Amino acid sequence: MDSKIQKLVILFVFEKMAIPLTEATVLDVCSSENDWLSYMECKQYLSELVDTNLVYRVPKSECLNITQDGISCLALFFTRIPSSIRDEITAYARDNRMRFKKRQSYFCDYSKNADGTYTVIMKINNESTTLMELKMVVANRSLAKFMYKSWVDKASQTYALLHDTLLD
């Protein structure tokens, strides 16, 4: 595939995923999880798409998204992408969109404190703001890791519980 088609592939991924994506997510989707582009080419073409205003950086976020010009460009030239790749991208987006949305919306990290305890930071973000940030100090690393691993699956449930409890 030539560089123009590879750039169209990236635009097609944005359109089909229908959510803003981090650069790391685009690189994973296009080159690690699928073999649509090489990592280095994907990184270069993504940067070029931003430079030419076909993709933009979402304000107050690490995410990127397709611009209206990018949508127009894709509408004119998407047929240049081989239909087999378009079908793969469409199926991949349908099957994985929510997984990536959760991964980007629900942030969690932990760090060791001077006294040997751990602070776990859990966040729920939307496209441009943090909806909730929760910090908890736990006794040891295993508890911090457990919370870290549980956060993506339990974030919305935790938010709803806190919201309902505080507003009762």
Annotate the PLM regions.
Residues 20-30:
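Short acidic, hydrophobic short linear motifs in intrinsically disordered regions
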Residues 71-90:
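Glycine-rich, Lys/Arg-enriched anion-binding loops that position phosphate/diphosphate groups
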Residues 88-165:
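Exposed, interaction-prone assembly regions rather than primary DNA-binding/catalytic cores
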Residues 50-60:
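A short, conserved structural fragment
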Residues 8-12, 28, 32, 47:
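Contiguous, well-ordered alpha-helical segments that form the cores/surfaces of helical PPI scaffolds
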Residues 36-51:
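Short amphipathic alpha-helical interaction segments
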Residues 1-20:
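Short alpha-helical segments that sit at the start of domains
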Residues 59-77:
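Accessory beta->alpha helical hairpin/"wing" motif in late/C-terminal subdomains of nucleic-acid enzymes
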